[in-house]
A protein has these predicted regions:
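Single, function-defining residue in the core of a domain
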Residues: 2-176
Length: 176
């Protein structure tokens, strides 16, 4: 969910040949999309190509829509100051209505041909089951607090709680 929108995460997934679909803050100050050149519409599906760099040359500064400066303090594993000076990131920004006056913005590298906006909405909606499961695991089952200090015992607690969660889900499926 929100909070995962970093160029470093996008690049790691892209380098592994995998796909991502990440919700981002919807426009304005403090949002990743606030600096993008996006359509002036409520809903859109816009292809983006950014060239990330740690260099602040005249060319980079003159083309802020093409280049994105990454500060040295921001982690990005595919750039350095000497050998790898530029990294190209390709993705889509998809914005769609979730209610009459509320919108969600998604950044994804899923192919547009296979995943039009309606499919993106469906995939985005699928995450709710996963999110509610994590909430149950953290709070109802107690996965946010451990009693052990050693790694192997913490792992044992995690597995025990996962088994308990799955057992509880199995029981509730047959009762309800």
């Amino acid at each position: 969910d929100r909070g995962y929108e970093t160029y470093n995460i996008f690049a790691h997934v892209q380098e592994k040949g995998m796909y991502y679909l990440i919700r981002v803050k919807d426009g304005g100050g403090g949002s990743m999309t606030g600096s993008f050149d996006l359509p002036d519409e409520n809903e859109f599906d816009h292809d983006m190509q950014l060239i990330l760099t740690r260099k602040q040359t005249k060319d980079v500064k003159a083309k802020p829509k093409k280049f994105k400066f990454i500060a040295k303090s921001s982690p990005f594993d595919y750039l350095d100051l000497y050998d790898k000076k530029f990294y190209t990131l390709n993705f889509r920004v998809v914005r769609f209505a979730i209610s009459e006056d509320s919108y969600e913005s998604i950044i994804t590298n899923l192919p547009k041909e296979d995943f039009p906006v309606e499919e993106i909405k469906k995939v985005y909606a699928m995450r709710w089951g996963i999110e509610t499961s994590f909430r149950e695991l953290k709070y109802a089952i107690g996965l946010c607090c451990f009693h052990s200090k050693k790694v192997e015992y913490i792992m044992q607690e995690i597995y025990a709680r996962l088994i308990l969660y799955n057992y509880c889900e199995l029981i509730t499926m047959h009762v309800i």
